[in-house]
């Protein structure tokens, strides 16, 4: 708990598929997926597990005709969040979204949409947060703000976070441990420092390139 695990790999290696399996959206062709020690494929387990799991992906669009506030209220109701109005106000304030609360999400910039997506993912205070390229295509300032918030959330709430990313600097800054994927398999794992030392490289990017090219 309270840790951020990086998931690195080239396009098509299975990062997004792995997240889909952890959400119970994709059935594995072999093996079993356990989340919080419970089999996610078991229908009786899945609903309970997903009450405390959430995710962010730039490939999932927000409902464009709903306002920021409406998005959060609808999502919060799906999770049965208690004291929902207070929670929505609190999280909009934390993510500097108050001034946009009555604006439709289709009218927002990419950075603003990402903050709304983050707010949605945190509305139920998840124990496990799955992030698929959460800062992709963002301006440096917005990306840095999102990274800082994710880092603080893990530390303060004790959440476990899985971060799939192509941004090596992001992974080095945030992650306690890194897993390297290739062709649907984990081919190496460890702390950033241990992986760099093990493969005799100067930084994580060089280490990653060496591993995936072998």
Q: What is the predicted function of each stretch?
A:
Residues 31-42, 48-49:
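Conserved ABC transporter NBD signature motif
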Residues 73, 77-100:
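Conserved ABC ATPase "signature" region
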Residues 104-108:
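Conserved ABC ATPase signature
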Residues 125:
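Conserved catalytic motifs of ABC-family nucleotide-binding domains
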Residues 129-132:
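Catalytic Walker B motif of ABC-type/P-loop ATPase nucleotide-binding domains
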Residues 144-156:
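Helical segment within the ABC ATPase nucleotide-binding domain
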């Amino acid at each position: 708990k309270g840790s951020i695990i990086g998931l690195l790999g080239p396009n098509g290696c299975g990062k997004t598929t792995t997240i889909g399996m952890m959400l119970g959206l994709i059935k594995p062709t072999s093996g079993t997926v356990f989340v919080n020690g419970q089999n996610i494929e078991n229908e009786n387990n899945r609903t309970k597990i997903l009450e405390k799991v959430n995710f962010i992906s730039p490939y999932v669009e927000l409902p464009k005709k709903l306002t920021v506030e409406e998005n959060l209220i609808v999502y919060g109701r799906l999770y049965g969040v208690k004291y929902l109005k207070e929670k929505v106000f609190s999280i909009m304030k934390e993510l500097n979204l108050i001034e946009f609360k009555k604006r439709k999400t289709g009218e927002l910039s990419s950075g603003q949409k990402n903050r709304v997506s983050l707010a949605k993912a945190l509305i139920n205070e998840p124990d496990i947060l799955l992030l698929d390229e959460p800062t992709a295509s963002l301006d440096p300032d917005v990306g840095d703000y999102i990274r800082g918030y994710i880092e603080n959330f893990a530390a303060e709430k004790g959440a476990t976070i899985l971060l799939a990313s192509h941004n090596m600097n992001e992974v080095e800054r945030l992650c306690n441990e890194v897993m390297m994927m290739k062709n649907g398999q984990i081919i190496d794992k460890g702390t950033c420092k241990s992986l760099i030392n093990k493969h005799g490289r100067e930084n994580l990017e060089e280490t990653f390139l060496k591993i995936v090219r072998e």
